[in-house]
Design a protein with these regions (language model features):
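Haloarchaeal acidic low-complexity proteome signature biased toward cell-envelope/secretome components but also
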Residues: 1-3, 134-135
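C-terminal binding/interaction regions
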Residues: 37, 78, 86-136
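Glycine-rich phosphate-binding loop
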Residues: 47, 51-88
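Alpha-helix C-cap/termination motif
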Residues: 31-32, 58, 95
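Conserved active-site and cofactor/substrate-binding residues in soluble primary-metabolism enzymes
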Residues: 16, 20, 24, 43-47, ...
Length: 136
């Protein structure tokens, strides 16, 4: 059975979007009989690499799934945040030799578009489980 770490980027002023993504991630894990051994909530997507690294260091974590959303604002800030998070998570995965999957939606999307993509939480978990099983 695969044991997962789950990182949840909380930057969602209404709260429901991220809560739905996290719940989709938990349901996907349960559906595959994987165990989420720890969840770490962080303020935003930019903060996810550090939390993913802490989880990837643990001997009881086979893979880490990261969920969150980067919604478009009035500047290019969303692009900068999304790029930094994606690169940071890739670095963690390679440095720790542990699957770290990206379930952060965006950038360049509206709140409505983000809401339509809550299933990415489940996709991140599915990918994490597949990688942990295939790379064993």
């Amino acid at each position: 059975m695969v044991q997962l770490g789950l990182v949840i980027a909380q930057f969602d002023k209404s709260g429901s979007l991220i809560a739905e993504m996290a719940e989709a991630a938990r349901e996907a894990a349960a559906g595959r009989e994987a165990t989420v051994v720890e969840e770490v909530a962080v303020p935003g997507a930019y903060d996810t690499p550090l939390a993913a690294d802490r989880l990837a260091r643990r001997s009881d974590v086979d893979a880490v799934a990261v969920v969150g959303a980067v919604v478009e604002g009035d500047t290019d800030h969303d692009q900068v945040i999304a790029d930094a998070a994606a690169q940071g998570l890739t670095d963690v995965s390679l440095d720790r030799d542990t699957p770290v999957t990206l379930g952060i939606t965006g950038p360049g999307m509206s709140r409505d578009e983000a809401g339509a993509r809550v299933g990415y939480g489940a996709r991140a978990v599915e990918s994490a489980i597949d990688l942990a099983e295939n790379l064993g």
